[in-house]
């Protein structure tokens, strides 16, 4: 019970920051030697975060849905990661990347990318009028968020900063 409370707390905090909540769940579970930490538990915790967002932002989401073009672009950008995630789960490959070495490398690599975007002052604003080409680009790069250590929001923000 304590491990579920701790993992829920970590998920609740990490999900809303541009850091990988999945990597933090793995790190906490490894550090405390939790035996039941699995992909199924991670998915359950992510679903809990998703439901919390829907409840909290219900009115905003209804207004957001009225902007059909932006809504469509966000849905479109989610398709690559959903399809790839499904394939990785069905083939069992997802379990091979859920480890501390992957977390270390992805954190290092994407930290460097973020540093580069900061160093070169890549300050792009995410506007409602970004192109469908940009939508696809960001969607494809979100596939990388399937690796623990890569934040989905972090990779989307970093990718957007590199757009023309």
Predicted segments — roles?
Residues 1-164:
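Multi-pass membrane proteins that catalyze or facilitate reactions on polyprenyl-/lipid-phosphate substrates
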């Amino acid at each position: 019970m304590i491990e579920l409370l701790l993992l829920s707390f970590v998920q609740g905090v990490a999900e809303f920051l541009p850091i990988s909540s999945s990597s933090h769940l793995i790190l906490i579970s490894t550090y405390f030697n939790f035996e039941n930490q699995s992909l199924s538990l991670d998915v359950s915790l992510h679903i809990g975060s998703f439901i919390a967002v829907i409840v909290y932002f219900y009115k905003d989401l209804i207004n957001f849905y009225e902007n059909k073009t932006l809504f469509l672009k966000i849905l479109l950008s989610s398709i690559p990661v959903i399809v790839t995630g499904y394939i990785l789960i069905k083939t069992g490959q997802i379990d091979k990347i859920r480890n501390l070495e992957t977390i270390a490398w992805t954190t290092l690599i994407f930290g460097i990318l973020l540093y580069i975007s900061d160093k070169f002052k890549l300050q792009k604003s995410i506007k409602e009028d970004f192109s469908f080409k940009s939508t696809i680009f960001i969607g494809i790069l979100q596939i990388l968020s399937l690796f623990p250590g890569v934040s989905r929001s972090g990779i989307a923000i970093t990718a957007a900063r590199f757009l023309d």
